[in-house]
UniProtKB/Swiss-Prot annotation:
Protein name per the record: BBSome complex assembly protein BBS10
Gene Ontology molecular function: any one: ATP binding
InterPro entries in the record: BBS10, Cpn60/GroEL/TCP-1, GroEL-like_apical_dom_sf, GROEL-like_equatorial_sf, TCP-1-like_intermed_sf
Keyword Oxidoreductase: no
Length: 713
């Protein structure tokens, strides 16, 4: 059975998923009760958990949920918003398709021909979406949205410092949509305390990478207790009991082994021949003596704790008790890796342990004791950290296992979100301008002699060589201020006049200072003259300025912002194209409650109004309208001044008057996470638009290994 892949089919599937997401989105959302295919009942507000619990048969639905899961693995946030935003984009495309439907209704066109024409149309839109995402979207974020950034870091004379209040607002907004109303404040406060206890420095990137990667080993779930009993424990908690526990005082040294300490009769690939019982008993005595010697040597090195990834023979445990050495067996590879990352300790090899030389691979621990949580015994280790992470374990309690698992999932997602927040997000885009070029020879000013430096000489030689060989002219665009006005967001707009304006070096330096560090290194093909370009309106003032090399200060800010020059032949109308790279700095946030969506919609519409290319205009308006669907749902329960129309109009008035926006909700959300969500949804939409045909294949479910083994018997 085959069906045509179309926007209409995808919209029907997405609307079913949207009906689930709408019920639990936002602070006013409720919990959704569903039954898993296994018969287990799930009550949750976590969008990712609900989507993964669905038994989906439609291939488009499975593909959409797979895209959501892939996004959550990176960011840990945005599952419900993903579905809502995608659904609004599909509605917009469906409306576009309905408008152009008349061109395909001729009687002499067969149905399959109309289908392939539609496929070609959607594929062209998919290509336009990809071009817009890779070449334009980052520019709008970098030049317009950046002026509204807030930060979770507080500036002080000592440098960047994480603000606890900002982190609390960020985490409270995050957990508000994932756990019940009765617990989200307690959970967010617990998470905030955990972050500050684990961080040895303010950077946090290394800490959150470790917390994300080793979350299962740093978390302990306990059922049968209220959520309020959840707490933070200093040190590392291993979910197993001691094979041998010997209380120890004073300095406690620890070693890790990954092999059996008791010598074997023979090694792998060889055989040991015994001709008599006497030889066997003699061999047994030698093995016993050798094992005792190894354990005595460990005691002589003040080793009082032995961690092993394999199960040791009873003789090793017996000798450990004689030497007052505690033993913890059967550590997983992940647990061994975590201990190694925290302590910097490498596993001991058997020859080193068996010899009488000093054991180098050992470390001190603060304490080593058993821990009992709800009748279960655990190993509690006080590890001394050699990295930025101070070891602490999280004990999450709940009356039932399902609630504990939901809180564990929410915590893990929060660590992913914070990991991305504390990392700079790269933005890559292209600047394109069209203007009238003067093919006359390039003029040099004598002031170049006064601003002489090796860097400027290097770039002057490049431009001179370009002039002699390719007869090219190049341009350097510098934008004053952190954000761009509406006139700066034009694509390919020709300037009607050029006005020569002398600019002093001090003024040029001031303009360069206005650029953020990540954009101060923009080096385009530059015209060696200073020109102000009018916008055609004699009363309007353009902020785009071309700067000559005699006033150019080359930035050493490598890795933050740069533009690769693209040479164009000198014509009456030349196009300058700069490949720019910038970043969303670590710690950037916006007020929660649709601020990101309203701001991006506003700047996308401003860009669409000044766009000369029709496809970019359509894409900009499509994304802008779809983004507004998210705050509409968030403010749907609100009435009066708190309703969406009032919030939206106040936001527009504030933007037009260059005043700060006022959010209707308290809390913050990560800018990097929201931008990643936007790009992930666009990539999912591109996949949907490239589907021509959906073929359903009915087959028997594959047998598992257990079923096959039973059939064999």
């Amino acid at each position: 059975m085959a069906s045509q892949g179309s926007v209409t089919a995808a919209l029907r599937v997405a609307e079913v998923l949207e009906s689930i997401a709408n019920r639990c989105v936002g602070p006013e959302g409720g919990q959704v009760l569903c039954t898993k295919p296994t018969g287990e009942v799930l009550l949750s507000r976590d969008g990712g958990c609900l989507l993964e619990a669905l038994h989906l048969e439609h291939p488009l639905a499975r593909m959409i949920v797979a895209c959501v899961s892939s996004h959550l693995k990176k960011t840990g946030d945005g599952a419900k918003t993903f579905i809502i935003f995608l659904c609004h984009l599909l509605r917009g495309l469906h409306a576009i398709g309905e408008k152009g439907k008349d061109s395909f209704t001729s009687e002499n066109i067969q149905s399959h021909e109309r289908h392939w024409k539609n496929c070609c149309q959607w594929k062209s839109i998919s290509q336009a979406l990809q071009t817009f995402q890779t070449q334009t979207l980052g520019c709008i974020v970098d030049r317009s949205l950046s002026r509204h950034y807030l930060s979770v870091f507080s500036s002080s004379t000592e440098g960047r410092k994480l603000c606890r209040h900002s982190l609390e607002l960020l985490l409270e907004a995050y957990f508000c949509g994932r756990v019940g109303r009765n617990n989200h404040r307690f959970i967010s406060q617990l998470m905030c305390d955990y972050v500050f206890k684990c961080m040895a420095c303010e950077s946090g990137v290394e800490v959150f990478e470790l917390l994300d990667h080793c979350f299962a080993e740093l978390n302990v779930g306990v059922t049968g207790l209220p959520v309020s009993d959840s707490r933070i424990i200093d040190g590392l908690v291993l979910p197993r009991d001691f094979s041998m526990y010997c209380p120890a005082d004073g300095d406690i040294r620890m070693v890790i082994v990954t092999e059996i300490l008791q010598p074997q009769f023979s090694s792998a690939g060889s055989e040991f021949v015994l001709n008599s019982e006497t030889q066997f008993q003699a061999s047994q005595c030698w093995i016993t003596d050798r094992t005792k010697t190894v354990m005595n040597h460990l005691r002589g090195q003040n080793v009082k704790l032995l961690l092993t990834s394999v199960k040791q023979p009873d003789l090793v445990i017996y000798c450990a008790r004689l030497n007052s050495i505690s033993v913890v067996e059967c550590l997983s590879a992940e647990e061994v890796s975590l201990v190694q990352r925290i302590t910097g300790l490498s596993p001991c090899v058997l020859p080193e342990v068996a010899s009488q030389c000093e054991i180098s691979d050992s470390t001190l621990v603060k304490f080593c004791k058993p821990l009992i949580l709800r009748s279960k015994r655990y190993v509690h280790l006080g590890l001394i950290s050699t990295c930025a992470f101070i070891p602490h374990s999280m004990v999450l309690c709940g009356p039932v296992l399902g609630l504990v698992e939901q809180h564990e999932r929410a915590f893990h997602g929060a660590f992913k979100m914070l990991r991305q927040l504390f990392t700079d997000l790269d933005l890559n885009y292209i600047i394109q301008t069209k203007q009238q070029c003067n093919p006359s020879p390039l003029a040099y000013d004598n002031s170049r002699e006064r601003n002489h430096s090796p860097e400027t000489d290097k770039y002057q030689d490049i431009v001179a060589k370009s002039k002699n060989k390719l007869e090219t002219q190049t341009h350097l665009e510098v934008y004053s201020g952190l954000g761009a006005s509406d006139t700066e967001l034009r694509a390919g707009k020709p300037w009607s006049a050029h006005k020569k304006t002398p600019i002093a070096p001090s003024q040029t330096d001031e303009m360069l200072k206005c650029l953020p560090p990540e954009r101060s290194g923009i080096i385009d093909n530059c015209d060696l003259s200073i020109e102000n370009h009018s916008t055609g309106n004699p009363t309007a003032e353009d902020t785009g300025t071309e700067i000559s090399f005699e006033h150019l200060q080359v930035s050493d800010n490598a890795g933050k912002g740069y533009t690769l020059p693209v040479m164009r032949k000198s014509l009456d109308t030349c196009t300058c194209q700069g490949y720019c790279s910038s970043t969303v700095p670590a710690g950037c946030v916006l007020p929660v409650g649709g601020s990101f969506e309203i701001l991006m919609s506003y700047y996308l519409l401003s860009y669409a109004k000044q766009c000369r290319q029709s496809d970019e205009t359509v894409i900009s308006m499509l994304i802008a309208d779809a983004l507004l669907g998210i705050p509409k749902i968030l403010y749907k329960p609100k009435k009066g001044k708190d309703s969406f129309p009032h919030i939206y109009m106040r936001s527009l008035h504030a933007l037009q008057a260059s005043q700060p926006m006022v959010s209707g909700q308290s809390g913050f959300e990560s800018v990097a996470g929201k931008y990643q969500l936007l790009t992930s949804v666009l990539q999912c939409l591109m996949k949907i638009l490239t589907i021509d045909l959906i073929i359903n294949i009915k087959r028997q479910p594959q047998k598992t290994a257990d079923q096959e083994s039973e059939d064999e018997f």
